[in-house]
C-alpha cells in the first residue's frame, strides 16, 4: 500500500483540525447510534469511544452521508444538506466558531481515516489487503479534491 501517502495525508489532515476547540466528544455519533422511541424520545448509544475531543466531530458524523466503501460524488451535497438542516437547532444550544464550521469536511475525512484503523484494530491486519488500502486512500483524495472548493479556495 501507499503507506507514506497515508501518513502524509493523515499528518496534513491533523494539522487542519488539531487546534479546534476541545470538549466532550461521543466519537461515534452516526445515525445508527441515535434511536428514537415511539413516544418521540431520542437515545444515544455506544459510548466506548467517547472522550475529550472535538465536539464538532460529533456534528460532522451526525451529518455525514458519505459511503465508506465507495466514493460517491453526491456524499458531499447530501452531507452539506443535512448540516444546513441540523445546524439551526444545534446553534440554539451550542455556539460554533468559523474555524469549527470550516472543519466540517476535514472531520468527515478524519472519520473515514479513523474507520480504517478501527477495522484493522478489531479484525486484525489480515482483514484488509493492499488494494483495499489503496482504494481507501483514493477515496480520501477524491473527497479532499471535491471539498477543496468549500474550505480551501
Predicted regions and their residues:
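An alpha-helical support segment within catalytic cores of ATP-dependent transferases
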Residues: 1-27, 37-39
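All-alpha amphipathic helical-bundle segments outside canonical DNA-binding/catalytic cores
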Residues: 96-108
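Protein kinase-like catalytic core scaffold
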Residues: 23, 43-45, 55
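Active-site activation/catalytic loop segments of kinase-like enzymes and analogous catalytic loops
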Residues: 56-94, 111-126
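ATP/Mg2+ or Mg2+-diphosphate-binding catalytic cores
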Residues: 115-153
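Conserved catalytic-loop position in the HRD/HxD motif
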Residues: 28, 46
Amino acid at each position: 500500500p501507499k503507506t507514506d501517502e497515508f501518513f502524509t495525508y493523515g499528518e496534513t489532515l491533523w494539522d487542519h483540525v488539531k487546534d479546534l476547540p476541545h470538549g466532550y466528544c461521543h466519537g461515534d455519533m452516526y445515525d445508527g447510534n441515535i434511536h428514537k422511541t415511539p413516544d418521540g424520545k431520542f437515545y444515544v448509544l455506544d459510548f466506548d469511544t467517547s472522550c475529550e475531543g472535538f465536539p464538532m466531530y460529533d456534528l460532522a458524523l451526525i451529518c455525514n452521508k458519505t459511503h465508506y466503501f465507495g466514493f460517491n460524488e453526491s456524499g458531499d451535497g447530501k452531507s452539506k444538506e443535512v448540516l444546513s438542516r441540523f445546524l439551526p437547532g444545534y446553534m440554539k444550544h451550542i455556539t460554533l466558531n468559523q474555524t469549527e464550521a470550516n472543519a466540517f469536511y476535514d472531520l468527515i475525512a478524519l472519520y473515514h481515516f479513523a474507520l480504517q484503523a478501527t477495522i484493522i484494530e478489531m479484525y486484525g491486519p489480515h482483514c484488509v489487503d493492499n488494494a483495499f488500502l489503496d482504494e481507501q486512500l483514493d477515496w480520501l483524495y477524491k473527497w479532499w479534491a471535491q471539498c477543496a472548493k468549500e474550505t480551501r479556495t
